[in-house]
Amino acid sequence: MVRGRFAPSPTGRMHLGNVFAALLSWLSAKSQGGKWLLRIEDIDPQRSHREFAELIMDDLRWLGLEWDEGPYWQSERGDIYEHYLKVLADKGMTYPCYCTRADILATQAPHESDGRVVYKGTCRNLPPDSRRGPAAIRMRVPEEGEGIVTFTDGHYGPQTVDLTSQCGDFIVRRKDGAWAYQLAVVVDDALMGVTEVVRGRDLLLSSPQQIYLAGQLGFRSPHFIHHPLLCNEAGQRLSKRDRSLDMAALRERYAPEEIVGMLARAAGLQATDAPITAADLLPAFSWKKIETADLTF
């Protein structure tokens, strides 16, 4: 059985882009007769707030996007992440990193496409007597040419990524002790039996890192399906800074069926903005109808 999930971070009110991701994830799982899980990714103690999580759940119910399991809270799963971090450490797959953001930026110019900076492995082979102060924990990736990850995205097709040249050794625990996204999401997806991950294409490059990490932990990776982003007329992706498009503002102006209808039209699932419930949209759902280019809303 397909087991999809929606995993929002409670750092603010959901905006239309978040709702789009939730709707597509729900439609994809439910159209296959599957289950849909809700996981609250509240591992950042400085930015996550319980009240935002409660609002997210209220908004999902209001939109007709009911979940079958959860909510699961990442903030309650630290002991589990600790166990799997030790598994990696015992295999010699991790090391402490003392570099600051400024240190890393100074070693290499950002990739022109998205501003990423590939970590050069400065701390990878530091002798023990050089290891002082707070440290992040990084996951080793193979030497260049040996870390090729290939997978087929459910919407964007075959993907090939060289982890060494395109990603570098990545963080699995932050310097402040908080758990990094990559470790938490891989462990949770595996232990929760998630078989399908639907999310925005801005997270496409996270997939090879997660596939590699899952393999090192003996987990089977879910099927990844990335979707185009919703953008404004200037081509900028929608974000939580767009207060006019967050759920507080949208609920004052529209009924849930109107919001679903507008998103369905943007996705190419229907020809107009005609109001429709998420459940009534299920027969029309197909990934083949959705463009790969970002969508203007």
Question: Predicted segment positions?
Answer:
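Structural motif
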Residues: M14-L16, D176, R253-E258
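Alpha-helix boundary recognition
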Residues: K86-D90, A190, R251, A264
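Active-site cores that bind ATP or allylic diphosphates and position pyrophosphate for catalysis
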Residues: A102-S239, D246-L250
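Catalytic adenosine-cofactor/nucleotide-binding cores of aminoacyl-tRNA synthetases and other
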Residues: T100, L205-S206, Q216-F297
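N-terminal Rossmann-like or analogous alpha/beta NTP/dinucleotide-binding catalytic cores
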Residues: M1-E112, R201-D202, S206-F219
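Bulky hydrophobic/aromatic packing residues
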Residues: W26, W36, I43, L60, ...
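Active-site neighborhoods of enzyme catalytic cores
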Residues: H49-Q159, Q166, A274-F297
